[in-house]
Amino acid sequence: GMFGGDVHLRAYADLQRAGLSPNLGRCGLDQWTRDLAGIEFDLVAVATRSEASAQKSAANFKEWTGHEPKAYHGETPWEDVLRDFPDLDVMAVSTPDHLHTPVVLAALENGTHVITEKPMCLNMTEDDLIIEAANAKGLVVGVDMHKRYDPDHMRIRDDVTNKIGDPVYGLAVLEEPLEVSTSTFKWVEDSDPFSYVGPHWTDLFWHYYHSKPAALTAVGQKKRLVRDGIDAYDAVQVRVDYANGMSVHYHNNWILPADFEGPVNQGHEITGTDGKVESDQQYRGF
């Protein structure tokens, strides 16, 4: 899929070719780096639901790197991977949202660290199980939160938040095209727009202020997708009131029309006691 095949697999191809550069702690950028890399990396397996998808991913990886991982497929292919590679160091999870938890828990039970796409899971019960399992075995569960590394966002965190005073309220928007919910993903009835992309923004505001939520309200609408026989939320609006007195509204949908001016619409703003900052990621405006 989009995350597994385009985002994760290409990142691991860079690691396969170049390793992790010593001292820099980052992926090498050329074919000579691996000879000097402090950590070597081997993608030993790819696992998907269908055989065709697994074979395609393995073939693409071989084309990019010259190394072909073993391909697995089925309803629970991660179990086969862990059986064949019991000493696996890291399991990367980019399944549909509602299928993260069984893979993560199986990896932790095996003693394997985890990298997972957001959201880590979809409810607090699963969240508690994952945290308990990771802590019990001293393992890391890393969740992909790349919004915090956008240059504009780092500037807000390190500089602008110190200039606008105490935060009063904020707004964060990430809206996806209708194609995502009607064609790209087949599992939207098992998740919702906020669970899918909202964690990027909740993580970002945590990264800015390190203030915990004190209260939360959420509403959602089902009007557009039901016309296509899809029983899923079109949009979700979440208000989070934080311990520091700040209130933030998170707006997410996956029903933008095909002729919208950008592939997605995203941005956020913060109003403080002494100033205001606006950041529009659609145009990279600040």
Regions found by a protein language model. Give the residues of each.
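N-terminal glycine-/serine-/threonine-rich beta1-alpha1-beta2 phosphate-ribose binding loop
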Residues: G1-N110, D128, E132-K137
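A short helix->loop->beta-strand "cap" motif at the edges of active sites that frequently abuts
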Residues: N110-T112, K137-L139, G245-S247
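Redox-cofactor binding/interface segments in oxidoreductases and associated redox assembly factors
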Residues: A92-V93, T116, A172
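ADP-ribose/adenylate-binding Rossmann-like module
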Residues: N110-N123
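Predominantly a Rossmann-like dinucleotide-binding segment in NAD(P)-dependent oxidoreductases
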Residues: V140-G142, K147-I230, V238, A258
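NAD(P)-dinucleotide binding in Rossmann-like oxidoreductases
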Residues: I230-Y233, D241-F286
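Conserved PLP phosphate-binding loop immediately N-terminal to the Schiff-base lysine helix
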Residues: M120-T125, L129, Y149-P151
